């Protein structure tokens, strides 16, 4: 039971990050910068206690991974600014699952059995259905301005997905240990955060406030590393997708994002489809 609890913690931590970002304020640029500094602080503390070996490869790969994480996070927060948390997060999660899955299949040949192929295809279908259901628009949102924001938000999310994809796969391509990559990743995140935001004057009180989400993100990362050897990569991957419940429903219940009954139904059912897809992909990976 304790092992499963540890495996659920990343979902709880990561699912709450955007809620903290929005509540703490400051816009996407200050939020991005503050989050990266929070991750760096946490990673320095972990490094002091864990003392992982840092080779040139680990440092280089970790920094590149962190740079692309910053690209993913900054654009996800921009999309949230346009579309809201409860709409952005299910779509973002779905796009990330599709991207990482297809990359895993094409490059790493993850679906090696008939069962994994069937489960994988079913999962991708579930993701598409889930994303469509969570994207339902109300009549008010069909006006020109809202429609333009939605289209722009989707394009920005595609860029975000590329960032998150490279952040994940570059570590795997070079077979770098997660604990070893943690500090170089955080350095890359800060560098990426500065490069992406400095033109927008993000160094303010909101950036300092948003150090908190960065600490939360890094804590979630740490618990993922702890839980994977205990429950396996497949289970930890599946459980980590549950964060979508916290972020999406939190956007509605905590941040007060308004939804029609039709949209609420679509969001709930869509989340179920995306979570089911995450579980199936976890099984297909095992």
Swiss-Prot record:
Q: Which GO terms describe its molecular function?
A: carbohydrate transmembrane transporter activity
Q: What is the lineage of its organism?
A: Bacteria, Bacillati, Bacillota, Bacilli, Bacillales
Q: Which residues form a coiled coil?
A: none
User: What gene name does this entry carry?
Assistant: glcU
Which CDD domains does this UniProt record tie to the protein? Answer: glucose_uptake_GlcU
Supply the alphabetized keyword list. Cell membrane, Membrane, Sugar transport, Transmembrane, Transmembrane helix, Transport
The record's annotation in SUPFAM superfamilies points to: Multidrug resistance efflux transporter EmrE
- Annotated membrane-spanning segments are 4-22, 27-49, 53-72, 85-107, 111-133, 154-176, 181-198, 211-228, 233-255, 267-284
What is the protein's given name?
Answer: Probable glucose uptake protein GlcU
The domain of life for this entry's organism is Bacteria
């Amino acid at each position: 039971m304790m092992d499963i609890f540890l495996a659920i913690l990343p979902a709880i931590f990561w699912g709450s990050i955007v809620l903290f970002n929005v509540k703490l304020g400051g816009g996407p640029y200050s939020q991005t910068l503050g989050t990266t500094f929070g991750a760096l602080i946490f990673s320095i503390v972990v490094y002091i206690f864990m003392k992982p070996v840092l080779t040139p490869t680990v440092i280089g790969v970790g920094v590149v991974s962190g740079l692309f994480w910053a690209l993913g996070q900054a654009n996800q927060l921009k999309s949230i600014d346009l579309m809201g948390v409860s709409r952005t997060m299910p779509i973002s999660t779905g796009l990330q699952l599709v991207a990482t899955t297809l990359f895993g299949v094409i490059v790493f040949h993850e679906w090696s059995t008939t069962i994994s192929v069937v489960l994988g295809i079913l999962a991708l279908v579930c993701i598409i259905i889930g994303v469509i259901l969570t994207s339902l628009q109300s009549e008010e949102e069909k006006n020109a301005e809202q429609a333009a924001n939605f289209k722009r938000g989707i394009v920005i999310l595609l860029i975000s997905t590329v960032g998150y994809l490279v952040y994940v796969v570059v570590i795997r391509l070079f077979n770098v240990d997660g604990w070893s990559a943690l500090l170089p990743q955080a350095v890359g995140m800060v560098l990426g955060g500065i490069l992406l935001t400095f033109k927008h004057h993000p160094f303010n009180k909101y950036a300092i406030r948003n150090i908190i989400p960065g600490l939360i993100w890094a804590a979630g990362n740490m618990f993922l590393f702890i839980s994977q050897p205990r429950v396996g990569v497949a289970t930890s991957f599946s459980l980590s997708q549950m964060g979508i419940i916290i972020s999406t429903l939190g956007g509605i219940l905590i941040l007060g994002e308004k939804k029609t009954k039709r949209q609420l139904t679509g969001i709930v059912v869509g989340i179920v489809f995306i979570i089911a897809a995450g579980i199936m992909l976890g099984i297909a990976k095992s």
